[in-house]
Amino acid sequence: MDDHTRDPSVDPPRPDWDRTPTGWNPETGEWDHATLRRAVVLGVRLYNSGAFHESHDCFESEWYNYGSGTTESAFAHGMVQVAAGAYKHFDFENDDGMRSLFETALQYLHSVPNDYYGVDVLDVRTTLTNALDDPTVLDGWQIELDGRRPEAGPEEYEHAERLE
């Protein structure tokens, strides 16, 4: 664990969830990189609320904490591309741009564990792959986190504003 990514205030996975996601260390009761978990929670909630640009910013600000070649970097960079692709699709109706970003996201997410920091990465990869042929699969799709599909509240939007 790196000291610059520690944060004891970051909550553990849901206690009623029957999985231990990659990134959670049950022996220490901490996330390997708590700031990554915080960015994941915020970024997923914002994405699921349709705030794709803000979601992108959450993942991007965390991505810079990791050196290239690490799983953390690949995951964060992939999620940046996921949010940017959705932004292109929904806000600009630019499906060619979406496809380009999703193809890059799939490259980054290729070797990331299927359940990384609570995100159902397998579902993300499957949805992106399907969206390359049929962008309408994104309509109503939300990212699963800890077995749920949470949305943003005022706290997440306030955090995103502070990133700008």
Language-model features and meaning:
Residues 1-164:
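Acidic, polar-rich N-terminal leader regions of halophilic archaeal proteins
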